[in-house]
Amino acid sequence: MADLGFGDARSGNGSRSQCSRGKAMLLALGKGLPEQVLPQEKVVETYLQDTICDDPATRAKLERLCKTTTVRTRYTVMSKELLDEHPELRTEGTPTLTPRLDICNAAVLELGATAARAALGEWGRPAADITHLVYISSSELRLPGGDLFLATRLGLHPNTVRTSLLFLGCSGGAAALRTAKDIAENNPGSRVLVVAAETTVLGFRPPSPDRPYDLVGAALFGDGASAAIIGAGPIAAEESPFLELQFSTQEFLPGTDKVIDGKITEEGINFKLGRDLPEKIENRIEGFCRTLMDRVGIKEFNDVFWAVHPGGPAILNRLEVCLELQPEKLKISRKALMNYGNVSSNTVFYVLEYLRDELKKGMIREEWGLILAFGPGITFEGMLVRGIN
């Protein structure tokens, strides 16, 4: 890992250089989770009861999906009490967008505030020192947006500069890191609070043969929030950075805009995921990663550490095979998927939390690493990062 100082960023593989002057760093993390814990072994019964479904074929398919996701635990806003209050949510063909948004807007604010307070507590400085807020969600829709309500709830100064990134799906967290990095490096002395908050309430509905992906969502996706604080020029006596954000890039794959497809309707959001998503990612991932690694002259994929948004096990498996990665390279991504499910924009931050733990324990020998996420577009988000002692 790099020492906390200033120097030339281009050190190559295997060396331990000082940190680059003016580069953004990850200073703190936090998360917020719903009270309802959903063990994977209870998903089938819970979902079928919640949706009043007794179809044997649906049960069999959901059981198969739950076994293949590798998820063990998720957290969810949805509850029996919520469904008792809003029985229309489990009635097929009912216009429910308004109550769904009412539930989602309140839930993401509460979860986001919890995550932000956790990050602020770890950071150790007052909320008034936050100069910018980057807010990410694919679960709310309102004016003014959740960024304003979150800033108010946290007691941020009225002149805090706010940026919202909405409906970016699974690439939203990495996009927020890229945005925060650019803000921090172009506004000396700034401290950027990043908050991502998601819930699956917007897409919850009874199973239907016309929407086979609904069962994938029931088996894979979870709810939660995460937060991070980004800044350049850390104060040695007050801040403890663990990751330097060196270089970021984004790329979309032309002609793939229907592979990850979501539409807001009167019944919520209808979401579809193409079976060829892992293949599409595999076809481009090597060149995309080399664009990042070439910045520091690294040629071998096993010579960096990896923090990949775990959209599902199929994508991680394809990456591991395609790039000939050692099994431990994607261990923290698989761990995040196992313990939280796919929480859309949040999940990459849960991966980074595990990365921080391994960096602190000296379990990672590589100096450089990659953060990756894939979202609608198909959009690739990538960042070259460096661990800090």
Swiss-Prot record:
Keyword Translocase in record: no
Q: InterPro entries annotated for this entry?
A: Chalcone/stilbene_synt_C, Chalcone/stilbene_synt_N, Polyketide_synthase_type-III, Thiolase-like
* Tissues expressing this chain: Expressed in anthers. Expressed in young and adult flowers.
The processes (GO biological process) annotated in the record are: flavonoid biosynthetic process; pollen wall assembly; polyketide biosynthetic process
* Phenotype caused by lack of the gene: Small pollen grains with irregular shape. Reduced spikelet fertility and mature seed formation.
Can you tell me which residues the record assigns to a coiled coil?
none
Q: What class of enzyme is it?
A: transferase
UniProt keyword terms in alphabetical order: Acyltransferase, Transferase
Q: Which residues form the active site?
A: C170 (nucleophile)
Assigned EC number: 2.3.1.-
Keyword set includes Coiled coil: no
Q: Which GO terms describe its molecular function?
A: acyltransferase activity, transferring groups other than amino-acyl groups; tetraketide alpha-pyrone synthase activity
Describe the function of this protein: Plant type III polyketide synthases (PKSs) that catalyzes the condensation of fatty acyl-CoA with malonyl-CoA to generate triketide and tetraketide alpha-pyrones, the main components of pollen exine and potential sporopollenin precursors.
For this chain, the family text in UniProt reads: Belongs to the thiolase-like superfamily. Chalcone/stilbene synthases family.
The name this protein goes by in its record: Type III polyketide synthase 21
| Organism expressing this protein natively | Oryza sativa subsp. japonica (Rice)
Where is the organism placed in the taxonomic lineage, from the top?
Eukaryota, Viridiplantae, Streptophyta, Embryophyta, Tracheophyta
